[in-house]
Structures are given as C-alpha cells and as structure tokens.
C-alpha cells in the first residue's frame, strides 16, 4: 500500500466536496470539536467491487461485469475480502470494505416476519475500496493511501496540492410537508397493542418507530454539510449511492472490534446542553438521578450482554462503565460500556 502525506485539513467536508458526486463515495466524519474524542476522518469512492442485495439474493459488480448470485451478501463479502490489504497500525483503514447493513437484513437472520416492503433499496451494500484519504487530527496531517496509482488517484493528488476552499452555497429546498407512513389511528392502535404486550409480560421494551418522508429539491450533500456542522455528532457519515443518499448524525458507536475484544457503548437517557452554567449543572444532576433513564439504559445493557454472550467466550462479557454521563455538542447522554 502506497502512502503520501499532504497538509492538514481540519474540516473533512472541505475536501470531500472533491469526490462527493463520484460513484459510491463515502465520508466517515468524526466532527472534530471539544466534545469529539475521535482521531480520524476517512473518505473514499469508486470501489473496485460492489456487493449489494437482500436476503439470499446478491449482486456483485466490478468494472467488467455484473453478476446476480443466490447467496447472502455477507457471505459474499467474506469471500471477496480474502485478498488481504496491507495493515498499518497507525491508520484506521488501508483498503477494504465500507458500507451499510439494515435492520431488515438482521430480521431475516432472526427469522422475524417482514412487513410488505415499500422501500426499494438493498438491505446490504458494501464497496471494496483500494484507496482512501485519511485525516489524522492527533498529528495534524492528511494521508492518501492507495494500491495503484490510477487516473483517479493522480487527480486527487493534483487537487490536494492546489486545493482552495470552495465556498459554494449548495441549494436545498423542502417542497412538501412531512408525512408519516402511519396514520394517527394506526399509530394509536399499535401503541395500545404494545402496552398490552408489556402488561401481559410478553416483552419489556419495544423500539416503536415510524418513517417520515417529504419531497425535496437540490443537493443532499449540501444539507449534510449544514446538519453535520450544526449537530457535531462524532459518528457522522455520508454515503452516496445511485439508489439512495444515506446520512448519519449519531453520537453512538454500535460496535468496535479490536483483535478479539469487542466493545459496545449503548446510550439511553438524554438532557439538553444549556449555555447557562447553573441550568446545565441541573440538567446533568437530573439525568444522573433519573430512575426512568437508568432503567431504560440497564434494559439495553442486559440486551447487549445477552447478544454478546451468544458469540463471546463464556464469562468474558463484563460491564466496565455503567450510567456514565457524556456531553456532546447539544445534549448530555447516559452511556454504558
């Protein structure tokens, strides 16, 4: 793997604008600010292989062919990732797979009944990338890593050497009201059904959600930039696919694996950050002392301990932090590890 260093770009969104409209471009954005504890940002595009699909039906694309295969995308991903990439402990990524998995695919593994699908995108999509641009905020440098000096890589080099910030105002407009996929009557009916399940002891917590949609015009990348800079979430991401633009603004990392050690940090419990010092302290103390918030957090901790127990060595799962207060740009959270 080749490595070239460039000057430090503090804001990854500045230089991602160079590739944001390229094929399957991806930005993993740590939103460096006084609340962020992340070291790296990473971006890439134009994967050598694309793997996507639903259930046991997959599509594999490269620059020469497109194959439909009767096998789940995760198994295919393992197969194509056998060609290892050179490791560098100083970098978080030296080539490999980047993409997303949906709850819908997870439901298939758990044999949970699926409702009728009205959202025509893959349940899983991963690109295998052989180049990336990485910003290291600790040592304040930008690093281009690549396997081959392709035309795209050379173009990126040239653009970085002569880069000037583009202050283009991206246009984005909302052309309709938000619309839920549930009517008010349907929502109330389902809510009451959930209450009855809990009272009867069939379950003790349900994540009941609804999907909102609207019509829009303009640049999705523009709205991502605006929202990312407003929220400052440490696990933000922008994924540009032909079938969808995916934006993430999350304070929460689901899973981190380092060798044989796996970590999850569930968040349950929230209070707003106040500019008034006294009120802010009150919000933190209120969150610390909330039986309701602690009970919800503990439910998720127990759930994840159980999930880890299915895959980890017996007796190796432990809670190292319970009900810790962490502060982000706009909110205080109750976090366990």
Regions found by a protein language model. Name each.
Residues 1-337:
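Extended alpha-helical targeting/anchoring segments
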């Amino acid at each position: 793997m080749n490595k070239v260093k460039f000057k430090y770009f503090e804001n990854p969104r500045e230089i991602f604008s160079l590739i944001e409209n390229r094929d399957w471009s991806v930005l993993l954005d740590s939103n460096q600010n006084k609340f962020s504890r992340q070291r790296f940002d990473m971006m890439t595009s134009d994967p050598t292989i694309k793997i996507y699909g639903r259930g046991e039906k997959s599509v594999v694309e490269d620059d020469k062919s497109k194959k439909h295969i009767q096998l789940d995308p995760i198994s295919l991903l393992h197969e194509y990732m056998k060609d290892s990439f050179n490791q560098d402990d100083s970098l978080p990524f030296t080539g490999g797979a980047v993409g997303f998995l949906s709850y819908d695919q997870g439901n298939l593994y758990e044999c949970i009944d699926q409702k009728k699908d009205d959202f025509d995108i893959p349940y899983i999509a991963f690109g295998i990338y052989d180049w990336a641009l990485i910003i290291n905020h600790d040592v304040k440098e930008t690093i281009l890593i690549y396997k081959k000096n392709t035309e795209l890589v050379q173009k990126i080099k040239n653009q970085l050497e002569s880069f000037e910030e583009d202050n283009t105002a991206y246009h984005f407009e909302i052309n309709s009201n938000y619309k839920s996929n549930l009517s008010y009557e349907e929502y109330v009916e389902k809510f009451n059904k959930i209450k009855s399940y809990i009272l009867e002891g069939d379950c003790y917590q349900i994540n009941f959600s609804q999907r909102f949609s609207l019509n829009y015009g303009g640049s999705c990348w523009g709205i991502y930039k605006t929202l990312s800079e407003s929220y400052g979430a440490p696990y933000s991401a922008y994924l540009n696919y032909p079938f969808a633009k995916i934006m993430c603004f999350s304070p929460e990392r689901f899973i981190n694996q380092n060798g044989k050690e796996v970590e999850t940090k569930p968040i349950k419990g929230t209070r707003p950050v106040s500019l008034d010092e006294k009120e802010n302290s009150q919000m933190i103390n209120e969150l610390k002392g909330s039986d309701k918030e602690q009970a919800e957090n503990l439910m998720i901790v127990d759930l994840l301990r159980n999930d880890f127990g299915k895959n980890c060595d017996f007796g190796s799962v432990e809670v190292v932090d319970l009900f810790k207060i962490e502060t982000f740009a706009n909110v205080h959270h109750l976090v366990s590890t």
